[in-house]
Regions:
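SAM cofactor-binding core of SAM-dependent methyltransferases
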Residues: 1-78, 83, 87-90
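Conserved acidic-Pro-Pro-aromatic motif
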Residues: 27, 34-35, 83-90, 94-154
């Protein structure tokens, strides 16, 4: 996909990365030498990322923050990112829709957002915004989170 977009910036922002071992942007960093920002709410995960060779060998910034729609722009800007970016990846198992809607400090060429397939592909559904949202606290199954694909397309 990135090869089909002319003059795509070689920068990315990804949040909800956990240890960054299974991330949407990892190959862009390693194989294409993109510069990026990764964010996770767990200090342990961020410490793991910062101790990996991928962190010091590449242009990677790793920030520990619990993201909500009120702080996401400040987090992105304080890490030195604004304007055009190549890819934005959102996977926070909860307020993904609301956080994406709030982002206005970057303009990504490509956006990857986790959607909830349980909500189906017919109706526009998003969980109500709750800055304290925890997927497993919301419902024991862990299946109540995020938004339907229709909501994200709209």
């Amino acid at each position: 996909m990135i090869s089909r977009i002319p003059h795509i910036p070689h920068t990315f922002i990804e949040f909800g990365v956990e240890s960054y071992r299974e991330a949407n942007t990892r190959l862009l960093l390693k194989l294409r030498n993109w510069r990026g920002l990764v964010i996770d709410g767990s200090a342990d995960y961020i410490q793991r990322i910062q101790s990996q060779d991928i962190y010091w060998r590449h242009f990677l910034t790793a920030e520990c923050a619990y993201i909500d729609r009120n702080n996401i722009n400040a987090i992105i800007q304080s890490a030195g990112f604004d304007g055009e970016v190549g890819l934005l990846s959102i996977d926070i198992d909860g307020n993904d829709y609301w956080v994406w809607e709030a982002i206005d400090v970057v303009n990504p060429a490509i956006v990857v957002v986790e959607y909830n397939a349980v909500f189906g592909d017919v109706q526009s559904i998003a969980i109500p915004y709750n800055p304290e949202f925890q997927r497993l606290n919301a419902h024991y199954s862990g299946l109540y989170f995020g938004a339907s694909i229709v909501a994200l397309i709209e």
